Amino acid sequence: MRLSQYFLPLLKENPKEAEIISHRLMLRAGMIRQQTSGIYSWLPLGKKVLDKVCKIIREEQERAGAVEILMPTVQSADLWRESGRYDDYGLEMLRIKDRQKRDLLYGPTNEEMVTDIFRSYVHSYKDLPLNLYHIQWKFRDEIRPRFGVMRSREFLMKDAYSFDLDYEGSKTSYNRMFVAYLRTFSCLGLKAIPMRADTGPIGGELSHEFIILAETGESAIFCDKKFFELTVPHSSIDFSDKAVLANIVKQWTSFYAATEEMHNEEEWAKVSDNDRLSARGIEVGHIFHFGTKYSAPMGAKVMGQDGKEHLVSMGSYGIGPSRLVAAVIEASHDENGIIWPKSIAPFDFGIINMKPNDEKCTRACETLYSGLMQAGFDPLLDDRNERPGSKFATMDLIGLPTQIIVGPKSIAQNEVEIKDRKTGVKKSLTVENVLNQFFRI
């Protein structure tokens, strides 16, 4: 993409309404625009990052055996009355009526609808286990939406729902998603720590939050530093091996880790002083095992091998892709802007033409641009007639992992400068060596 043809509405000043780093940088980098309180449009740069986050989530869900569906944003109130949650959910739920005066709602979550889908089609234990997931926009009418897309009223969610014959099978499905989440966050460049959590309005008996460390995190967290020595499972892991899954979950839950709400001073005192870490954290995922909480009132049953009907045991597993984008920025930025992990950067390279009216500079930039695209990369070429300082500031702000700087002095020596956005380290290479290096990747 050529920046002269791209829609990138940058802001020079920090917006007054932005209280945290991610909100400030997402507005300044032209990623989002607020339409009304807690509701945002995603502009081209932000949409590219959001799509890459969703791609990684999909890959890891499907690696773990989940099957994608798509459920509507608008749901019938009757399903929620059937589960008993319609009156319990409170003012966060946006309730609406159609022209026939039927009660509808804009879904804040999908346990009822997916249970209805399941009970309509699945009737035998032979069709279990089953895990269905979707990625869809949701709405919760937050009392005080703030922090940009970190706590917005409309947000994108990946929800997965598992169905099993009994508790043992359901626990394995829970472990499977637990491990899939560890891998997902690792692929996004994040070190997420699983912590026991309150089940909240979703309900159930077992729950873990996945927390990343960030100075501007919304909650205090307490954890053992040994978590940072653990290795995330490789992509070759066998998700059908119950023992392997259980062992990984045991390993990742054997050290103390708790949010402020679940913190236990007696247990914390057992952790050695050298291993204690008190910090701030951001929730990036939440998983629940809730057994028959929804299958019982909604009659989701299957015929077992014993010839009897069994209520299915369920779990739900949520990741917010839109929130994750902000969380990554909170965890990875500096005073100049965003520092994207390579896996979700909106573009792979930023090519800076310091002097567009210089024939040699322009020719070198075009060679690099076409060569990188041929190699399967997605470069952004800054071909605007702007001051070099402005171009450097733009590239630092939007956080592309690698900058390729083409100026008249260096190109006279047939060289360009490569800058690593994260480390700031620069090196000079010939145009040919740049292309040869990245063709080998």
Curated annotation (Swiss-Prot):
Keywords: Aminoacyl-tRNA synthetase, ATP-binding, Cytoplasm, Ligase, Nucleotide-binding, Protein biosynthesis
UniProt subcellular location: Cytoplasm
Entry similarity comment: Belongs to the class-II aminoacyl-tRNA synthetase family. ProS type 2 subfamily.
S-S pairs: none
InterPro entries, alphabetized: aa-tRNA-synt_IIb (IPR002314), aa-tRNA-synth_II (IPR006195), aa-tRNA-synth_II/BPL/LPL (IPR045864), Anticodon-bd (IPR004154), Anticodon-bd_dom_sf (IPR036621), Pro-tRNA-ligase_IIa (IPR002316), Pro-tRNA-synth_IIa_bac-type (IPR004500), Pro-tRNA_synthetase (IPR050062)
Enzyme class per UniProt: ligase
Name of the protein this chain belongs to: Proline--tRNA ligase
EC number in record: 6.1.1.15
Keyword Protein biosynthesis listed: yes
Gene that this polypeptide is encoded by: proS
Subunit structure: Homodimer.
GO MF terms held by the record: ATP binding; proline-tRNA ligase activity
Main location: cytoplasm
Cellular component aspect of the GO annotation: cytosol
One GO term of the biological process aspect: prolyl-tRNA aminoacylation
Naturally occurring in which organism (per UniProt): Bartonella quintana (strain Toulouse)
